[in-house]
From Swiss-Prot:
Topology of the protein relative to the lipid bilayer: Multi-pass membrane protein
Expression induction or repression: Up-regulated in the presence of D-xylose, L-arabinose and D-arabinose.
Organism for this UniProt entry: Sulfolobus acidocaldarius (strain ATCC 33909 / DSM 639 / JCM 8929 / NBRC 15157 / NCIMB 11770)
Alphabetical list of CDD domains matching this protein: TM_PBP1_transp_AraH_like
Role: Part of the ABC transporter complex XylFGH involved in the uptake of xylose and arabinose. Responsible for the translocation of the substrate across the membrane.
Compartments it resides in: Cell membrane
Protein name: Xylose/arabinose import permease protein XylH
Annotated knockout phenotype: Deletion of the gene results in a growth defect on D-xylose and L-arabinose.
Domain of life: Archaea
Similarity field: Belongs to the binding-protein-dependent transport system permease family.
Entries under PANTHER family matching the protein: ABC TRANSPORTER PERMEASE PROTEIN YPHD-RELATED-RELATED (PTHR32196)
Amino acid sequence: MNILNVVRRFEFQLFLVNVIIALFFYFENSAYFSSNNITTIFQYLAEIGIIAIGEAMLMLCGEIDLSPPALANFVPLITLTIYNSIYQAISPTPAIVVSILLSLGLASLIGLMNGLITTKAKVNSLITTVGTLFLFNGIALIYSGGYPESFPYFRFLGGTVSILPVPFIWSLGALVFLILLLHYTKIGVWTIAAGSNPTGASEVGVPVDRVKIINFIIMANIGALVGIIQGSRVLTIGATNFTADVVLEGIAAAVIGGTSLVGGKGSLVGAFLGSVFISELLNGFNILGINAYEFDAILGGAIVVVMVLSYYAKRASYKLKSIATATSSSPEGKDRITKILKFKIQKIYRRVEENE
């Protein structure tokens, strides 16, 4: 890849926008680049960034999940309960590992439920996960009585290394893992195919429902991890730690980063850079004394602009494919399109197998 191709990439352009924003806030207030403020930016970026890349994966296959805040509130309560039940029987460190793994297993079951309702019962994922959001937020409130719980045993997950918060390091690890999953495994191939053309992908052997369920499970685990990591940082957990704002900002970051809401197109790096964009604005506005309401208005405006541009880009793409669409109405046209799609998927399979 030459320099010109790099410059043309949307991710590079978004990176430059983030640099310009950071420099603007620095010239407005030099405290913006202080070590304490950088740590603050990274702390918020860690949470929204993990959610953004998870949502980007799910949006790539044409679905969306609004339930992570509920899982971030509910699952850590279960983690703490398991830890308190077993730490005396085994030493504290193994108890931490076991409690996290078991609670992530619970999160996986919730993700499986979201996936099955969406794919098998044919309920729109937006409706499914709004229901899950209210369901598990309610359970968390009942379970905790509405009171916060102390969460001191997991503090190492939320500490700092120099000016870098440990949660930010976790977010980078999640980004690398999902990039490898998307670009170098069959699950990644299936994810893109399912979002691009679910009917055609199914005809050439892609297990569309299965890959969507897998991505719902991944998203549920991400929501749970965000709750555990944030609880480790502030040393308390509860049913009101997270609101729907965090997932909406994560989705906004994914959209700003170039991920299409209708599936098949997107970038995990772009989603993470979108998280940087939102984190910089939120922190910079706070330093400049701009209130949160104005931030919400500006963020909403940015999302509307991106969505309008995305709509016209999609419309232009449909026009370019009009000939193929017209020919697909005949049996010969359908066979030809199916063969082309099958060839492309098999080509990607070969690339994945070579990397394995």
